[in-house]
Amino acid sequence: MAAPGPALCLFDVDGTLTAPRQKITKDMDCFLQKLRQKIKIGVVGGSDFEKVQEQLGDDVIKKYDYVFPENGLVAYRDGKLLCKQNIQGHLGEALIQDLINYCLSYIAKIKLPKKRGTFIEFRNGMLNVSPIGRSCSQEERIEFYELDQKENIRQKFVEDLRKEFAGKGLTFSIGGQISFDVFPDGWDKRYCLGHVEKDGYKTIYFFGDKTMPGGNDHEIFTDPRTVGYTVAAPEDTRRICEELFC
């Protein structure tokens, strides 16, 4: 059972509310709206706002009390924009260009079954780096993910970057199936907690699938301000929520 007092449920998106990069099912959407009648709900993801809308609906800011794209660097509360940070102002153009150039050079040397386009996506609060390219098809995405599980393509890439850019104040975080994020230290999903902790919640529950060390849910999952739950699929998320709140 849930702890007494005002509480908030924060959900990761991919692998938690939806299948990776897929739209939320009607059943899951309806369940969350019923859950919202009992507890405040919010979403926090690494993707930009447009991708969150693609997965959770154009009216996402009306369906959730909090919406935190890009780890909360872009923040909505009660349907209104709270703030928007940007990575270039924090890191400076020189470091960003060094990082982009190095990543492109590394990707050029990787031999994969397939490569597509959009290898680096520049977002407000991070760079998203994809060895296969974000424009790959769903079938190609799955093919890369299965290969990555065997050969640790992203993990090796990240380890190389950590050595090359040591001391530069950068965090490298693997999430989803085909990419990893690069952002300033402290700009992981914990960033969104700064927006909600002043709203008086006694308990902040967090649900995510990439909660292991190196995963992009790990920091917020282990943060003392949250009660974390690891899930493997949206069905897990629903089951745990039903046990806690229904």
Swiss-Prot record:
Name the residues that bind Mg(2+) 1.
D12, D14, D209
Residues at which Mg(2+) 2 binds: F221, D223, T226
Q: Which UniProt keywords apply?
A: Acetylation, Cytoplasm, Isomerase, Magnesium, Metal-binding
UniProt subcellular location: Cytoplasm
EC primary class: isomerase
Q: Which GO terms describe its cellular component?
A: cytosol
**Entry's EC annotation:** 5.4.2.8
| SUPFAM superfamilies, sorted | HAD-like (SSF56784)
What's its catalytic activity?
alpha-D-mannose 1-phosphate = D-mannose 6-phosphate
Which residues catalyse the reaction? D12, D14
Pfam families, alphabetized: PMM
Q: Do you know which InterPro entries this protein is assigned to?
A: HAD-like_sf (IPR036412), HAD-SF_hydro_IIB (IPR006379), HAD_sf (IPR023214), PMM (IPR005002), PMM_cap (IPR043169)
Instruction: Give the GO biological process terms.
Output: GDP-mannose biosynthetic process; mannose metabolic process; protein N-linked glycosylation
The protein's superkingdom reads Eukaryota
The pathway it acts in is: Nucleotide-sugar biosynthesis; GDP-alpha-D-mannose biosynthesis; alpha-D-mannose 1-phosphate from D-fructose 6-phosphate: step 2/2
Q: Which GO terms describe its molecular function?
A: metal ion binding; phosphomannomutase activity
Residues involved in alpha-D-mannose 1-phosphate binding:
R21, R123, R134, R141, S179, D181
Function noted in UniProt: Involved in the synthesis of the GDP-mannose and dolichol-phosphate-mannose required for a number of critical mannosyl transfer reactions.
The subunit field of the Swiss-Prot or TrEMBL record says: Homodimer.
NCBIfam families reported in the protein's UniProt record: HAD-SF-IIB
Q: Which PANTHER family match?
A: PHOSPHOMANNOMUTASE, PHOSPHOMANNOMUTASE 2
Name the family: Belongs to the eukaryotic PMM family.
> Protein name, please?
Phosphomannomutase 2
Protein's organism: Bos taurus
